[in-house]
Amino acid sequence: MIRILYLLVKPESMSHEQFRKECVVHFQMSAGMPGLHKYEVRLVAGNPTDTHVPYLDVGRIDAIGECWFASEEQYQVYMESDIRKAWFEHGKYFIGQLKPFVTEELV
């Protein structure tokens, strides 16, 4: 399974409520996406600083998204999809910045 995690920051000019609505629209647009096994998006509700190890300040993060793909082949199907291209265009509207991470399953 390939999983890509995205830290998302809304545009400065967008309200929190509008960002929330666009996250829902983006989730709805993911239905039936070729090659995409699963998509999740979660709004950041808080940012605790009482950690048991040194705190890493990465700035404001408004949401976390995650895309799942069953295989490299399915990821390529996704990347070549015209539907995915339209999905990315929507992302340009409501995502001001993002930081992606391809994760490796450990256990």
UniProtKB/Swiss-Prot annotation:
The active site is at H26 (proton donor/acceptor). Changing C67S: 5-fold decrease in catalytic efficiency. 3-methylmuconolactone binds at H26, Y39. Optimum pH is 6.3-6.5. Inhibited by p-chloromercuribenzoate. Isomerase involved in the degradation of 4-methylsalicylate and 5-methylsalicylate. Catalyzes the isomerization of the dead-end metabolite 4-methylmuconolactone (4-ML) to 3-methylmuconolactone (3-ML), which can then be further degraded through a modified 3-oxoadipate pathway. Can also use 1-methylbislactone but not 3-methyl-cis,cis-muconate. Homodimer. This is 4-carboxymethyl-4-methylbutenolide mutase.
